[in-house]
């Protein structure tokens, strides 16, 4: 129990890694995200599973890339689930999720004709909640509230893709969200989150809202100390060949302790979920980015959202 409490983020408790009571919004949502990259195999893994109980729908997106080339892809947004869905929200379609220890260990199992796996995630850092950065939607009234936390950890297990057995041992991430409410006000965001190693992690979430609000969430974890971001500058280069895809991001961040880092990122395999989810009307793309900080490589989330092509940012500053 003491180990579990060591990993609980600010503003949450042990029960928040379990399922949550369904809220009143028509598109109230609970979702689970798991991602890693194996540099030795150049293997990229990303899976997102969620439920909309009030709409009777579940969704699952799962991609496996090698060197940026898709080897397996599933994007299904219309699983039928009951409106009173309980713990079975962790197990529909081919994916089964199981919380072994809250905020410490999760198990992922998958059973489909081409892809099977059995993986465990073990946390190596305390989870980070957007409540810690005082994001307004975390404390909004019922019907507007939306909660989020994310966590760095270690993946182990096996995967079988088209008959090829693959041993997995890789640094990666997971995150959780529940509620919808204020997220409907999103008007674009850019997320960069990279564990270069257990001793160096950079987490940046730059968000714009339709009512004009902007907010920066994130942290630098370095030498066993984590501090919230104080400022960030993100310079984005868009691909000339792929109009909605980022080619490169140059980043400079400073945290509350005065530590500054300059890093760059480029996306590897890109997952385009734009206009697939029934509750969203933005261009939303996920990827694993290859990051560089002073010659050291790292691999982590690189996600971006925009509503119209004219709103694609070139520079974001906080």
Q: Regions from the language model: what does each represent?
A:
Residues 1-318:
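Structured soluble/peripheral alpha/beta segments that form catalytic or ligand/cofactor-binding pockets
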């Amino acid at each position: 129990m003491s180990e579990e409490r060591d990993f609980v983020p600010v503003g949450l408790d042990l029960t928040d890694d379990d399922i949550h009571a369904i809220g009143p919004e028509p598109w109230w949502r609970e979702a689970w995200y798991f991602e890693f990259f194996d540099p030795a195999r150049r293997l990229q893994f990303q899976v997102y599973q969620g439920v909309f109980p009030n709409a009777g729908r579940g969704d699952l997106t799962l991609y496996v890339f090698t060197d940026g080339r898709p080897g397996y892809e599933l994007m299904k947004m219309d699983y039928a689930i009951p409106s009173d869905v309980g713990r079975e929200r962790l197990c529909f379609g081919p994916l089964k999720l199981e919380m072994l220890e809250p905020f410490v260990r999760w198990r992922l199992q998958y059973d489909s004709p081409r892809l099977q796996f059995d993986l465990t995630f073990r946390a190596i850092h305390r989870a980070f909640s957007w409540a810690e950065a005082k994001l307004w939607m975390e404390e909004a009234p019922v019907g507007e509230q939306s909660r989020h936390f994310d966590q760095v950890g270690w993946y182990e297990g096996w995967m079988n893709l088209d008959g090829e057995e693959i041993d997995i041992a890789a640094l990666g991430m997971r995150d959780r969200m529940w509620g919808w409410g204020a997220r409907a006000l999103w008007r674009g965001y850019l997320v960069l989150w990279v564990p270069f190693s257990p001793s160096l992690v950079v987490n940046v979430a730059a968000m714009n809202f339709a009512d004009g609000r902007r907010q920066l969430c994130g942290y630098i974890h370095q030498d066993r100390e984590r501090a919230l971001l104080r400022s960030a500058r993100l310079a984005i280069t868009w691909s000339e060949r792929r109009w909605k895809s980022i080619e490169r991001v140059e980043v400079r961040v400073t945290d509350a302790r005065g530590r500054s880092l300059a890093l760059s990122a480029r996306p590897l395999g890109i997952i385009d979920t734009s206009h697939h989810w029934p509750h969203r009307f933005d261009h939303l793309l996920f990827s694993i980015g290859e990051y560089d900080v002073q010659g050291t490589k790292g691999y982590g989330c690189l996600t971006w959202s925009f509503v119209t092509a004219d709103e694609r940012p070139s520079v974001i500053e906080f």
